[in-house]
Amino acid sequence: SSIFIVKNFDPSQDYRILLAVDDSPGTSRAIKYGARVAQAFNIGVDILTVSKNEEFRDGYKGAAHRAAKFLRRSGIDAKNIFKVGDPSDTIVEIATNNHIIIMGASTRSPLKKFFIGSKPLDVMENCSCPILIVK
């Protein structure tokens, strides 16, 4: 199941997907959903990978490159964007009104979400564009 939150949607707007990618289990499902949406609406995908420090984990880079390869093989215009910073804040900063954010749901336990928070929830609360959270 997935959650689609629509904020400031304009049917006349030329959209791109902002696909948030890391090495979490939800990323592969988000990539597949992103491909379906991109194909259905004939739009391109910006694959965003954010690391808290300059050293990107191998899993992050690998996931981003696999996503780009999968999307391009599906006939979708895709480009990778690598940024350093807080993941939630960076996703919100990069996302513009012509983006539809697609990201995997958090895999944290309810207790961890309460104390630490959740990237998808943080993004959802702070972004001004549509967002699809894939579970």
Region spans (language model):
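Conserved beta-strand termini and adjacent loop/short-helix elements that scaffold enzyme active sites
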Residues: V6-N8, L48-V50, I81-G85, V134
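Gly/Ser-rich helix-loop-strand patches that form or flank binding pockets
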Residues: S1-F9, N97-K135
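Short acidic active-site motifs
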Residues: D86-I91, S118-K119
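Generic structural signal for helix capping and beta-alpha/helix-loop junctions
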Residues: S12-Q13, E55, S88-T90, K112
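Small/aliphatic-rich secondary-structure junction motif
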Residues: Q13-K61, H65-I81, I94, I100, ...
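Structured loop/turn residues at secondary-structure junctions
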Residues: F9, D22-D23, K83, T107
